[in-house]
Structures are given as structure tokens and as C-alpha cells.
Regions:
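Conserved short submotifs of the Hanks-type protein kinase catalytic core
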Residues: 105-119
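Activation segment signature within eukaryotic-like protein kinase domains
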Residues: 139-140
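Catalytic-loop of the protein kinase fold
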Residues: 151-167
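Conserved activation segment of eukaryotic-like protein kinases, specifically the C-terminal portion
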Residues: 189-202
Length: 320
């Protein structure tokens, strides 16, 4: 049992149950098709304490939801088995959720590691915007390491964003939400993702390479990490900053930005958000870029980063 995720039961009240096996005690996230709860196994209570997990719960209302669910489970299972990850625990596609009000629902669920430090998104925007180049470089290296695992298995995530990057109890990065992930090819045509992270080829309804799409999203993530702002308001030709990307006018894009970044960082981001997907930099080129080579990825520097994130977490908790 992991001591980091042990909690006193007296802190919580049951709000729902899955199959009379798992008690759910807190809602920690909600998306278009799924709700994420914090919960525990009723058969594994250790005295007054219990180990908590996260449960991604989907109401099974149509075949598309079940297809997406099965796809995510397959990918999580593959990544966990081949990379010795403890993130994925188990799943069920035929379960029942019992609410306290007596209502019950047919559901599918995925039981995953509870990542106690939450979304990276929160740490970027509060208490001050952005993490600066040095801290961002360390975090981005960890994100890239996670993406390498996904891409090495010939998958594309297709919904990379700061809200889908979680932090465990030691502030280590974990990418989550594989509902849109797909086997990579150059002829993907299904439209998905989050608007502020969409590459141009998706807007043009052209067949695209999923991993090149991930690179574009990583470029947006890097910009957000450093500055605490989005590079454009919306992925649309009507957005003046996105329009610069569509026309390849990167100097004009940067001249309109209020933030001042180093030349090497701007060059790297240019390569990642390049309009032409075939000319976008690869993961290997990101790692070997001048900006990434400026970093010192020592244990001591990661300790300093985690100290900064811990300070920010205290202020985030006060705000909430």
C-alpha cells in the first residue's frame, strides 16, 4: 500500500458506490462524457486509513462512448504493462453506480492512480502567471519523456493540454485522458481535441498525422508554461495570432506578444507550431534544440522546481 495516498476515512463522506465494492467520496473532475471521483476499495481498509484511487466514470449512453472507453483502456493497459507504470489499475465496462439518493446508473469505469497534486494547469496560472523559462524547461523535459513513451508505441494522444497533465505526490508529471488516443498514421481524419491546442490541418479537414498534431499541442503547452497565457484565443483564421501561424508570419506573431522570450525559445516554438505539419520539428529535434540544451536537468534543480510548485500549491489551496 502506498503511504503517499493513505488518507483517514474520517475526512470523507461517501457520495456513491460502484458495485458495492468501491466507495466514492469526492468529485475531482468532470468532462463532456466522464466524471472523475476519488474513492477507495471497501475490502482494503487499513485500520482508520485507506489508500485512495481515482475513478473515471462514464455513463454508458451510446456505442461511441463505449468505443472510446475500450480504446482508452487498451492504451492504458499497454503503456502500464510495458513501462512498469502504476497509473492504470483496472476497469469494468459493465458496472452499476449507486447514488446516495437511491438512483442507480449503468456505467463503465477506469480505476487509476490518484494523483494528489492535481492539474499542472493550476500551477501555471496562480498565484502568478507563468513559470519562466528555467522552471518550464524542467517540466517540459518531463512532459516530453512521457510523450516519447506514447509515440514509441505508435500512438498519438490527440488531446494534449495543461489540464491533461497531472502531478503525483512528488510533483512528477503524468499525462492522462487517453480517450482520443489513436494508432498513428498519416491519414487520420477524425476531428477531436481542445480548441486552443488545435493544429491548422484539423481546421482544414485534411487527413493528418496524429503525432505531428501532438507536436503542435506541445508547442502551445510550452508557450503557456513559460508565459501563463495562451498564444492565441481560439484556433480560427479570425484570431489575429492564429492567423499569423496560418500564414507563416512568425515575426509578426512574436511582435504582437506582450511577453519577452529568449531567441532560442521562440525558435523552438516556431518549429513546433509550424503551419506545415511535415515541416514541424520532431521529438528528437525538440530534445536536441538549443533551448533544451541550455538546461541543467540535475536532481538538485528538480528539487528547487518541486519546492516552487509546493509553494504555489499552498496558495492554490487557500484560493479554493
Amino acid at each position: 500500500m502506498s503511504s503517499s495516498n493513505l488518507y483517514y476515512l474520517s475526512q470523507f463522506k461517501k457520495i456513491a458506490t460502484i458495485d458495492d465494492k468501491y466507495n466514492l467520496v469526492r468529485k475531482i473532475g468532470k468532462g463532456a462524457t466522464a466524471t472523475v471521483y476519488m474513492g477507495y476499495d471497501t475490502s482494503k481498509i487499513n485500520g482508520k486509513q485507506v489508500e485512495m484511487y481515482a475513478f473515471k466514470v462514464l455513463k454508458v449512453v451510446n456505442d461511441d462512448i463505449l468505443t472510446s472507453f475500450n480504446n482508452e483502456v487498451s492504451i492504458l493497459s499497454l503503456l502500464s504493462s510495458e513501462d512498469n507504470s502504476t497509473y492504470y489499475q483496472e476497469h469494468s465496462s459493465k458496472s452499476i453506480l449507486y447514488k446516495k439518493n437511491g438512483k442507480k446508473y449503468d456505467i463503465a469505469y477506469i480505476k487509476i492512480e490518484y494523483l494528489s497534486n492535481g492539474e499542472l494547469f493550476d500551477y501555471i496560472f496562480y498565484p502568478k502567471k507563468g513559470l519562466g523559462e528555467n522552471f518550464s524547461r524542467l517540466i517540459f523535459k518531463s512532459i516530453i519523456d512521457e510523450v516519447i513513451v506514447i509515440h514509441n508505441h505508435n500512438y498519438a494522444h490527440r488531446d494534449l493540454k495543461t489540464e491533461n497533465i497531472m502531478l503525483d505526490d512528488s510533483f512528477n508529471v503524468k499525462i492522462c485522458d487517453y480517450g482520443f488516443a489513436i494508432k498513428n498514421s498519416n491519414s487520420i481524419q477524425s476531428y477531436c481535441g481542445t480548441n486552443g491546442y488545435l493544429a491548422p490541418e484539423l481546421l482544414m479537414n485534411l487527413p493528418f498525422n496524429g503525432q505531428a498534431n501532438d507536436i503542435f499541442a506541445l508547442g502551445v503547452i510550452l508557450f503557456v508554461l513559460v508565459t501563463g497565457t495562451m498564444p492565441f484565443r481560439t484556433a480560427s483564421p479570425q484570431d489575429p495570432y492564429y492567423a499569423c501561424i496560418l500564414r507563416g508570419e512568425y515575426e509578426k506573431f512574436w511582435s504582437g506578444c506582450k511577453c519577452k522570450l529568449s531567441e532560442n525559445l521562440m525558435k523552438l516554438i516556431d518549429g513546433m507550431i509550424c503551419f506545415n505539419a511535415q515541416e514541424r520539428v520532431s521529438i528528437a529535434e525538440i530534445i536536441s534544440s538549443e533551448w533544451m540544451k541550455e538546461g541543467e536537468y540535475s536532481e538538485e534543480n528538480y528539487k528547487v522546481l518541486k519546492k516552487e510548485l509546493s509553494k504555489r500549491k499552498k496558495k492554490i489551496i487557500r484560493k479554493k
